[in-house]
From Swiss-Prot:
The lineage of its organism: Eukaryota, Metazoa, Chordata, Craniata, Vertebrata. The keyword Transport applies. This is Solute carrier family 49 member 4. GO terms for biological process: pyridoxine transport. GO terms for molecular function: transmembrane transporter activity. Glycans are attached at residue 209. It is linked to A chromosomal aberration involving DIRC2 has been found in a family with renal carcinoma. Translocation t(2;3)(q35;q21). Mediates H(+)-dependent pyridoxine transport. It comes from Homo sapiens.
Length: 478
């Protein structure tokens, strides 16, 4: 496949000896699955049509979680007038996303020990509580702001599952030639939810009019508040529907595993964490993902705040954010499908994507400094640079996830992706923390984008790829 495999020791414990005829009954734990696999010629796995329903439910949950997380950034000007939010409040509302990743390792443990169903049910229940908390009708604005912050915090706690469990779901339910596509769909829908917040918020909630007389301003404030509450109630209703559907049907795994890798023995939680932290290659590629994606996520969450000095309206900022993420989702799924057909090309795909991301982020940053660079600052240039940046960075997410799992296999997928998304949100949190103190001048925030993309490009260039899980499915099962 054009790449060197990792050490023989890393592949040694994957397949256990012996085979009983009842493979489906034996696959109730990873250890039993390993013992149930044949020592000689494993048969191909079996896939079930219900896998698409499981993927749909999980993807909808991820979509709404991203939508709820990005509720306030696109309508920050309206939220200031309706609830008296400050710039610090707006930054903190976005910051609850990465703060929710602090108990990430607990969710990773739960996913590894109790499986997909229990973890997804807990996640959706937290989202029900969070979105419900924001809808409590209270006239006291101080208490209302606290409830909104509490709701955003609970929704942030759902982030570890919707961001980490996509590769686990794809390995559990999908065959080797569908895994990257399933991972892309499940992981990209969270970003698509954040993109739709750029569209829904500004279209439903009107922007404030600072030139209105006092009485008209009070009427406008009440109208804006009513429209924001309509959005909050709608999000609460959708979350309740998804929770009910998940409670009714979301099986933890199929009766039979879809591939050899899905049935093979994995490392324990403790051994997995130790393996990840001692693997220099993994740490290298994890930083290549975490730094630019963390910076970009924080930048996207306050895009309206960043574009306000450039005299970009709330609606235009919403459309820019929407198309940048939608383009990334479409290209990401297309890239993942391409990776399913032509295997062993993940590093090359990432090099191409981050070359484009470095150029487009530099273009955007220099455009915002038009008083120095004299580059044209127009709606077209802002649209083009932001959309290209979103396409290149967002589409890299599923490719990164597949490369992580291949690099450190047999570490479980949920633990692997949990570590890297924790790192990404840590960088995002640090950036937004500084934003709460340095929010009057934001050119430093823009320069973080090309700097992080260039650093990631260099790390990917030095990375030596390997495909241990693919080796197991393609070579061992033949």
């Amino acid at each position: 496949m054009g790449s060197r495999w990792s050490s023989e020791e890393e592949r040694q414990p994957l397949l256990g000896p012996g085979l009983g005829p009842g493979l489906g009954a034996s696959w109730r734990s990873r250890e039993a699955a390993a013992a149930a696999l044949p020592a000689a010629v494993p048969g191909p796995g079996r896939v079930y049509g219900r896998r698409w329903l499981v993927l749909l439910l999980f993807s909808l949950l991820a979509f709404v979680q991203g939508l709820v997380w990005n509720t306030w950034g696109p309508i920050q000007n309206s939220a200031r007038q309706a609830y008296g939010f400050s710039s610090w409040d707006i930054a903190l509302l976005v910051l609850w996303g990465p703060i929710g990743f602090l108990p990430c390792f607990a969710f990773m443990w739960l996913l590894d020990k109790r499986g997909l169903r229990i973890t997804v049910l807990l996640t959706s229940f937290l989202m029900v509580l969070g979105t419900g908390l924001r809808c409590i009708p209270i006239s006291d604005l101080i208490l209302k702001r606290r409830l909104i912050h509490g709701g955003q915090m609970l929704n942030g706690l759902a982030g570890p599952t919707v961001m980490n469990a996509a590769p686990f779901l794809s390995t559990t339910w999908f065959s080797a030639d569908e895994r990257a596509t399933a991972t892309a769909i499940a992981s990209m829908l969270s970003y698509l939810g954040g993109a739709c917040a750029f569209l829904v918020g500004p279209l439903v909630v009107p922007a404030p009019n600072g030139t209105s007389p006092l009485l008209a301003a009070e009427s406008s404030r009440a109208h804006i508040k009513d429209r924001i509450e309509a959005v909050l109630y709608a999000e609460f209703g959708v979350v309740c529907l998804i929770f009910s559907a998940t409670l009714a049907y979301f099986p933890p795994r199929p009766p039979l595993p879809p591939s050899v890798a899905a049935a093979s023995q994995r490392l324990s939680y403790r051994r997995s964490v130790c393996r990840l932290l001692s693997n220099f290659r993994f740490l290298m590629i994890a930083l290549a993902y975490a730094i630019p994606l963390g910076v970009f996520a924080g930048w996207s969450g306050v895009l309206d705040l960043i574009l306000t000095p450039a005299h970009v309206s709330q609606v235009d900022a919403g459309w820019i954010g929407f198309w940048s993420i939608v383009g990334g989702c479409v290209v990401g799924i297309a890239m993942a499908r391409f990776a399913d057909f032509i295997r062993g090309m993940l590093k090359l795909i990432l090099l191409l994507l981050f070359s484009g991301a470095t150029l487009s982020s530099t273009w955007f940053t220099l455009t915002c400094l038009n008083s120095i660079t004299h580059l044209p600052l127009t709606t077209v240039t802002l649209y083009a640079s932001c959309i290209l940046l979103g396409v290149f960075l967002n589409s890299s997410v599923p490719i990164f996830f597949e490369l992580f799992v291949e690099t450190v296999y047999p570490v479980p997928e949920g633990i692997t992706c949990g570590v890297v998304t924790f790192l990404s949100n840590m960088f995002m949190g640090v950036l937004l923390f500084f934003l709460t103190f340095y929010h009057t001048e934001l050119s430093w925030f823009n320069w973080c984008l090309p700097g992080s993309c260039l650093l990631s490009l260099l790390l990917i260039l030095c990375f030596r790829e390997s495909y241990d899980r693919l080796y197991l499915d393609v070579v061992v099962s033949v």
